[in-house]
Every structure is written in C-alpha cells, then in structure tokens.
Amino acid sequence: MGAMVAEPVGCSHLDQIHDVTPSAEGCEDCLRIGAWWVHLRLCRVCGHMGCCDQSPNRHATKHFHASGHPIVQSAEQGEDWYWCYLDEVAFELAG
C-alpha cells in the first residue's frame, strides 16, 4: 500500500471525488450473493459500496477494474482516508 499522507500528494484524480449516496449499508455485491466481508470501501465517483481486499471477494477492487472509478474512501467508523487505485496512494483530505 502507498504512503499515508495528510495532503493528497501524488493523486491526480481528486476531480473525480464526488458527494455520493452509498449504494447499500454493506457490500452490495456480498449482500447479493450471501457472502461476508471484513471492511467496507465507498466509491467516491458513483457510491458503490464494496468490500476491502482483505475480504474474500474484494468487490471494491473488482468495481474499480470494471468501472475505472479510481477513488474509494474507507467506510469504517472513525476512518477518513482515501485510496487512489491508479496512483496507488492513500491520503486524507485536509479541512
């Protein structure tokens, strides 16, 4: 995983971050197939709620590969970090 930084250094896709409504309260794909997940990631382009790479099905990453949407945000309580798949960098937004 890339370095965690206070400013989005190295991410050139900030213009794709939008205010979105989560598509589900859990991983929408796991809910559909009756699977489980470890942590949730919210696509900040379209609102797709997917599971993390530690989850068996890695639906957030699969969504990125299918859609090309590069930015996810942790949907875990108390976490406010983002990940850019294209630039492979984790970051938090200031302010």
Predicted regions and their residues:
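Cys/His-rich, Zn2+-coordinating zinc-finger modules
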Residues: 7-17, 21-26, 33, 49-95
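Canonical RING-type zinc finger of E3 ubiquitin-protein ligases
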Residues: 35-44
